[in-house]
UniProtKB/Swiss-Prot annotation:
InterPro entries: HGPRTase-like (IPR026597), PRibTrfase_dom (IPR000836), PRTase-like (IPR029057), Pur/Pyrimidine_PRTase (IPR050118). CDD domains: PRTases_typeI. The lineage of its organism: Archaea, Methanobacteriati, Methanobacteriota, Methanomada group, Methanococci. It catalyses: IMP + diphosphate = hypoxanthine + 5-phospho-alpha-D-ribose 1-diphosphate; GMP + diphosphate = guanine + 5-phospho-alpha-D-ribose 1-diphosphate. GO terms for biological process: IMP salvage; purine ribonucleoside salvage. It comes from Methanococcus voltae (strain ATCC BAA-1334 / A3). Homodimer. Keywords: Cytoplasm, Glycosyltransferase, Purine salvage, Transferase. It is found in: Cytoplasm. Belongs to the purine/pyrimidine phosphoribosyltransferase family. Archaeal HPRT subfamily. GO terms for cellular component: cytoplasm. It holds the Pfam family Pribosyltran. Pathway: Purine metabolism; IMP biosynthesis via salvage pathway; IMP from hypoxanthine: step 1/1. This is Hypoxanthine/guanine phosphoribosyltransferase.
Length: 187
């Protein structure tokens, strides 16, 4: 039986932005429709891959939030969202982020030295967001136990490994053509 994530990816609309084929999917964009069965599939598959003996789940805004919420509700592990705006809280860790399409700052709050954490995110493409999250967690003194991204596209996984030394698990690896999403690997 096909997984809900795989089915919805294969039916994703494709838009062209310059030379880039961009897929529109609820996990990455929140549209066209984010169903409970899709979120349940993603959360269940992620939980099966992680060590749940952790203190916190960490994600970056925005589309990692529903994933972290679903995992948190299923495991009773609290989660922290790295935000794009500064809150000026004590212990806040700022870090610069560069992705394939944007640059900016991310701010980590709510993680203490020695916290065991798992990072979850929606899409891994260039690795820029994930590298920034890892750097912030290292600055905070957290122990990164697992990293799971739902969708892998591009060379970000190898870039994250090369720059940070961390392995990233993904649920699906895709390619996007003008004809649609091609699932290269489904875990």
């Amino acid at each position: 039986m096909k997984k809900v994530l795989d089915e919805t990816l294969e039916s994703s609309p494709i838009i062209k932005r310059g030379e880039y084929n961009y897929f529109i999917h609820p996990i990455a964009d929140g549209v066209p429709l984010f169903t409970s069965d899709l979120l349940r599939d993603v959360a269940t598959r992620t939980i099966q891959r992680i060590d749940t003996n952790i203190d916190k789940i960490v994600t970056a805004e925005a589309m990692g939030i529903p994933i972290a919420t679903a995992i948190s509700m299923s495991t009773d592990i609290p989660y922290v969202v790295m935000r794009k705006r500064q809150y000026f809280l004590e212990g806040e860790v700022p870090v610069h982020q560069e992705t394939g399409y944007s640059k900016g700052e991310l701010y980590l709050n709510g993680v203490e030295k020695g916290d065991r954490v798992t990072i979850v995110d929606d899409v891994l493409s260039t690795g820029g967001t994930l590298i920034a999250v890892i750097k912030a967690l290292e600055k905070a003194g957290a122990e990164i136990v697992d990293i799971v991204c739902v969708i892998e596209r591009g060379d970000g996984k190898s870039k994250v490994k090369e720059i940070t030394g961390y392995d990233v698990q993904t649920l699906v690896k895709i390619d996007v053509t003008e004809n649609g999403v091609v699932i290269l690997e489904s875990n």
